Swiss-Prot record:
Bias (Polar residues): 65-102, 152-171, 328-338, 441-451
Name by which UniProt lists this protein: Serine/threonine-protein kinase ste20
Organism, as annotated: Aspergillus oryzae (strain ATCC 42149 / RIB 40)
EC number: 2.7.11.1
One Pfam assignment: PBD
Organism lineage string: Eukaryota, Fungi, Dikarya, Ascomycota, Pezizomycotina
Length: 848
């Protein structure tokens, strides 16, 4: 059958008159087979009654008033009950083809006349043509205003008498069922049964798209909504505030509350300066995570009066070595106040005081001094004249027994010059060797065991009376890290055991400089392992460079070659957690040099090493320790520097009383070095007597550039809290932005150190010292009236709290106090006296 003849409802008749006889049965069967679709009548389509008596010779069209088009209507008996409605509610067969012409019997049209239904049974029908007609009729009916018919009622039952359905109609309605996609339940609740009954319904084309989309979604599944899981491994960050109404801190952890109670800061002081306390506690909060290297400084603040089992010939800690780059900051606090061997007199005897990081810690002097807690050596009297020369001989060091019994009571932070280097740690069997230490034996001037036990630096046969006082010292600085320390305990203990054997194996298998030097003590390895297992430091890990990147940068700045073939006669004079300090002689010139060996794997901040090397290379000045060379030898970094055999300024201020002329000379040389650094945009940030080295001739040079910071026009301020607490400027303590003037404040504190023998607040806990620096501002001098007015004015300008009003290095170099400067040769006797006093101290303690 030709499909084009059924593309619309208007067909051309081959003749104007048809015979009554219908097509033969065979013809109908043949055409029925051509219809490839079995159609079924829609279940809800109305059944129209027919009059069996109306028959005629022709197929004449019967116009129906119940439909909009006579071409799509079914003849019915209007007299009987019927669901046929006006305006063609069904909508399936609506159209605009209003014609009365008769049609061919085989045209496939589905309108019927009064002819008997028996004659049309099995009449063929083309579904594709019907679908095209439906789409056209639907589009036309959408453009015509249609009056909404009344709703069909369930009581309306059509009269089905005399009507037999054709198989074509049944197949057609099944096809339309799939296209319209309606259910009986939908039509029972919705009066708009078909697409042409309402303006809001979708055409058949859209229904096809909807059906296809539903099919695809059913096959592929609808996209799932985004699900956000709960946070994993959350970390609680402590937030500390201050309630102005109640005058109390809010959000303080128990450890901090106990720390404040034991630090000697009264509630009255806390209420008087709440913002200062918040700043200090935030400082603790930040650095408890190990973000700043200042904690290393705290760790070694008082290393000299805590014992660690070492051989009597073990040299002092590299942490007290002025040549120790990062090793000085992360050094082992195993050394006493002064080095063991005389050749190490250049060594930095007093390591910077850091706050513990997961190591056994105890803060010293947490409460006011108990009766008898007076330094053995009274502070030196300020000089009366500029040309005054030291007249007091070095004090005799106490014996081991007297030190063990009286020293803990007199001063938890011993005064310099009175502590024999072979005191309890070296002269008597120490206790802590057999005791388990949390996360490493980090015993230092500000440290003890984190569990709050009595500090193990007292002789086993003698126990100090103020044990409770000592316990307070131990707990003060450890509380912020107890949780972290407990987590690191197991791993750090195993690593300590492994690394304790490494120095012995290295000595047995490799001819390294350690063989030339005295035997290393196992405690140094323990200190190294403790440093190798630092506490959790999330922020620092984010900022640390990759290990390979660090090594590549070091390769770029280091000299290629084997340093063991360039230097000979290495003598170990110091030991730190990162390595040892040696003196050696150059093969070519025969000059004596200082070599700092650092194990890169043990460095907490490798960037500081690179920073220090770069600063020293670019800072050639007569008042800065001369950097000679650097080498990468295996896993160690060798830094070769000028050897200052006179030692540090700390030795001089400990064993001698300095005149104003000598103090002025030291200040002048230090200011010259600072001016050079500041002109290059470098801030030293750790000026103190420990980092001022002297030669035997009295020449003065700066050292330890690991904490240097670069500033420029775009970044001319810093806010990182680094340095040693007792020498820190107020703007650093309160975490404000700072610049070059922080070095000037530290110089003023160092001047007080040369007057009194120690910096202000040294007998206070580090936390209270920070509080006093922030609240008191300019410190007071014990006997200020004995100073000349010019010297007092010099100190006043250097110790201005407001950095804008504080003098610069250039200003102080022009100050009248500089005219008091004594020749540098006048410092040579002080250096020699300090060396002699140290040698006598060793002899009395059995040192060799």
């Amino acid at each position: 059958m030709n499909h084009d003849s059924f593309s619309s409802l208007k067909f051309r008749r081959p003749s104007s008159k048809l015979h009554k006889d219908p097509p033969s049965i065979g013809s109908r069967m043949l055409k029925s087979q051509q219809s490839n679709t079995s159609l079924k009548r829609h279940p809800s389509a109305p059944v129209y009654p027919r009059s069996s008596a109306s028959r005629s010779r022709e197929h004449s069209r019967t116009r129906s008033n119940a439909y909009g088009s006579s071409t799509s209507s079914l003849d019915q008996n209007s007299g009987g009950p019927s669901p046929v409605l006006a305006n063609n509610e069904s909508g399936y067969f609506s159209g605009n083809h209003n014609t009365t012409k008769s049609r061919p019997p085989h045209s496939g049209r589905f309108s019927l006349n009064d002819q008997s239904s028996d004659e049309l049974i099995g009449s063929p029908f083309d579904s594709r043509g019907m679908l095209s007609a439906l789409q056209e009729n639907t589009a036309e009916s959408d453009r015509q205003p249609i009056q909404k018919p009344p709703t069909l009622r369930s009581q309306t039952t059509p009269d089905t008498r005399g009507l037999r359905q054709s198989a074509s109609f049944t197949a057609l309605h099944n096809r339309m069922d799939a296209l319209v996609n309606r259910t009986d339940s939908d039509r029972s609740t919705n009066t708009k049964r078909y697409s042409d009954e309402g303006n809001g319904t979708k055409p058949v084309g859209r229904s096809k798209k909807a059906s296809f989309s539903s099919f695809v979604n059913s096959m592929l599944g609808s996209p799932r909504g985004i699900k956000i899981s709960a946070p994993e491994n959350p970390v609680h960050v402590t937030h500390v505030g201050y309630d102005n109404q109640t005058g109390q801190f809010t959000g303080l952890p128990k450890e901090w509350q106990r720390l404040l109670q034991e630090s000697g800061i009264s509630k009255k002081e806390q209420e008087e300066h709440p913002q200062t306390m918040v700043d200090i506690m935030r400082f603790y909060e930040k650095n408890a995570q190990g973000d700043d290297e200042v904690w290393h400084k705290f760790d070694h603040a008082y290393a000299h009066h805590h014992p660690v089992t070492t051989s009597s010939s073990q040299p002092s800690s590299g942490g007290s070595t002025p040549y120790g780059t990062v090793g000085q900051r992360a050094s082992s606090p195993t050394s006493p106040r002064f080095p063991q061997n005389h050749e190490g007199s250049f060594e930095n005897p007093r390591a910077p005081p850091p706050i513990p990081r997961g190591a056994p810690a105890a803060t010293q002097a947490m409460s006011p001094p108990v009766g008898g807690l007076v330094p053995n050596r009274a502070p030196p009297r300020p000089p009366a004249a500029a040309n005054m020369t030291p007249a007091r001989p070095a004090p005799q060091p106490p014996t081991t027994a007297s030190y063990a019994t009286t020293r803990p009571v007199q001063d938890p932070w011993p005064q310099f010059g009175t502590i024999p280097e072979n005191a309890q740690p070296f002269g008597t069997p120490p206790i802590p060797e057999s005791e388990p230490l949390p996360s490493g034996p980090q015993l230092s001037r500000s440290n003890s065991k984190a569990n709050g036990a009595t500090a193990p630096w007292v002789s086993p046969a003698v126990t100090p009376s103020p044990t409770q006082y000592q316990q307070q010292q131990e707990q003060a600085m450890a509380t912020a890290q107890q949780a972290i320390a407990s987590k690191q305990l197991d791993r750090s203990q195993s690593l300590r055991q492994q690394q304790a054997q490494q120095p012995k194996q290295k000595q047995a298998t490799h001819p390294t400089p350690q063989q030339v030097s005295p035997v290393e003590d196992p405690s140094a390895a323990l200190q190294q392992s403790a440093r190798a297992v630092p506490a959790a430091r999330p922020r620092q890990r984010a900022r640390q460079s990759n290990a390979m990147d660090i090594r590549s940068r070091l390769v770029a700045i280091c000299t290629p070659g084997d340093p063991t073939k360039m230097y000979y006669n290495l003598n170990k004079i110091g030991q730190g957690a990162s390595g040892g300090v040696f003196t050696a002689y150059h093969n070519g010139t025969g000059s004596c040099v200082a070599i700092k060996q650092m194990n890169l794997d043990l460095q907490p901040k490798k960037d500081l090493i690179i920073n220090e090397i770069i600063v020293m290379k670019d800072s050639k000045h007569k008042n800065i320790v001369n950097f000679l060379d650097s080498y990468l030898h295996g896993l160690d970094l060798w830094v070769v520097m000028e050897y200052m055999e006179g030692g540090s300024l700390t030795d001089v201020v400990t064993f001698n009383i300095m005149s104003e002329g000598q103090i002025a000379a030291v200040c002048r040389e230090t200011l010259n070095g600072l001016q050079h650094l500041h002109s290059k945009g470098v801030i030293h940030r750790d000026i103190k007597s420990d980092n001022i080295l002297l030669s035997l001739d009295g020449n003065i040079k700066l050292t330890d550039f690991g904490f240097c910071a670069q500033i420029n026009d775009s970044h001319n301020k810093r806010n990182t809290m680094v340095g040693t607490p007792y020498w820190m400027a107020p703007e650093v303590v309160t975490r404000k932005e700072y610049g070059r003037k922080v070095d000037i404040w530290s110089l003023g504190i160092m001047a007080i150190e040369m007057i009194e023998g120690e910096p202000p607040y040294l007998t206070e806990s580090p936390l209270r010292a920070l509080y006093l620096i922030a609240t008191n501002g300019t410190p007071t001098i014990k006997d200020e009236q004995s100073l000349t007015p010019v010297f007092r004015d010099f100190l006043h300008l250097a110790l201005k709290v407001d950095p804008e009003k504080r003098a610069s290095a250039h200003d102080l170099l022009k100050h009248p106090f500089m005219s008091f400067c004594a020749p540098l040769s006048h410092l040579a006797p002080l250096v020699k006296a300090a060396r002699l006093s140290r040698a006598q101290e060793k002899a009395q303690k059995g040192g060799h």
